[in-house]
Amino acid sequence: MEQYQAYLELNRSRYQDILYPLFFRESIYGLAYGHESFFIENVDYNNKFSLLIVKRLSTRMYQQTHFILFANDYKKNTFVGYNYHFYSQIILEGFGIVVEILFSLQLFSSSLRGLEIVKSYKNLQSIHSIFPFFEDKLIYLNHKSDIRIPYPIHLEILVQILRYWIKDVSFFHLIRLFFYYYYKLNSFFFPKKWIFTFFSKRNRRIFLFLYNLYVWEYESIFLFLRNKSSQLQLKHFRVFFQRIFFYEKIKHLVEISTKNCSYTLFFFKDIFIHYVRYQGKSILVFKNTPFLINKWKYYYIFLWQCHFDIWAGLETIYINEFSQYSFHFLGYFLSIPLNLSVVRSQMLQNSFLIKIVIKKLDTIVPIIPLMRSLAKTKFCNVMGHPISKPVWANLSDFDILDRFLRICRNFSHYYNGSAKKKSFYQIKYILRFSCIKTLARKHKSTVRTYLKKLSSEKLLEEFLTEEDLFSLIFPITSFTFGRFYRGRIWYLDILFRNDFVNYF
């Protein structure tokens, strides 16, 4: 067991004096310059949370004892002088920036062995391997397990996870101060809400950092168990043909299981497990017996309950068969139906009927979630009828057409691998008429009049045809190729999933 504990000692760079860039204010500005966030983008921060304000606040921290007042008067909201609640939010934003920079440098800097990490996690940084996985491996798997990641985690568990990385004592005093302050603040105004409700709405950077750190911790343990179980060597037992030796075999098995951990993992050798984390959920895809699948289910539950002190019931993990279950994944609606075909075979004077079961992958564009996403972004109403975008009405005609065309191309590029494209054509119709209504609203004209004008100028050809899809890869033979081929094409240059998938 000691040799496996050595594997569980994860490679962590334990930082000392992590609060130095925050308190010595000149360093944080230099650190943050040129190091944009690797983990999040378009977070919609309020303008008041900027590095300049954090820098000014650090100057005031030396002039007055704000932390003492901040710790004692958490229920007060001053109207004259300093607003400590406002300052605490700014400090927390600056704290999140500093910690994120340090961890991003560890993951992506060559000086901290970042090249090895990038090579080992190369498949996790892009979406290239998802579509070949659909075609080549998914149809040969049997079961799928939906895992809802339990949170919020207890705050002290988060601090313990951070202690593996950081040795700065003042850092833990500060972060406990923040947790205590916001917990008391939320319990005073909203007694039934957790602290993560506040973090997720107002301090998204530090919330995402802590959440990703928590998920990374349990995924590291799970991947360790999965890798060790698949790399175990076979341990053969003697074959006992007589019944009198049966109990001797059981006794021998129990003794081995209690002495060495590797023999207990023997039962999980050569299992086919594919793990994907997507939008707060994890997906495990198996090709094995239900007995082993249930064992991994209980491993997950015990890991959360024993290691993270989070209650996770059996309803947290759902196991379903592919042949009887369809699911949403990365913006697609996937199903693997069983197609039964009968083949007649004749041998001499005898004829046989052979039934062959063939699995086929169906990738369908989910029309209802996409229409809901378009309704939230004001491209159509809740019934799916196109509406104009008044926010874009002050732009030029070229910018309006360019924006709609870019969105339409992204949809075409992402969903061209769908087997049934009727839903995709409906989405394209909504975008096309939303563009026309926006232009007609700008020029104070009717839709019919402006549609005739655009048709005469041939400005909407790319909305009406699909040649622009093939021109992205086949610029010369796009017209001929697009006319004769209407099959499923996966584009392997997609780096990010479609933005509208976030609203699913």
Curated annotation (Swiss-Prot):
Pfam families: Intron_maturas2 (PF01348), MatK_N (PF01824). This is Maturase K. It comes from Vigna subterranea. One of its GO terms (biological process) is RNA splicing. Keywords: Chloroplast, mRNA processing, Plastid, RNA-binding, tRNA processing. One of its GO terms (molecular function) is RNA binding. The gene is matK. It comes from the Eukaryota. GO terms for cellular component: chloroplast. Belongs to the intron maturase 2 family. MatK subfamily.
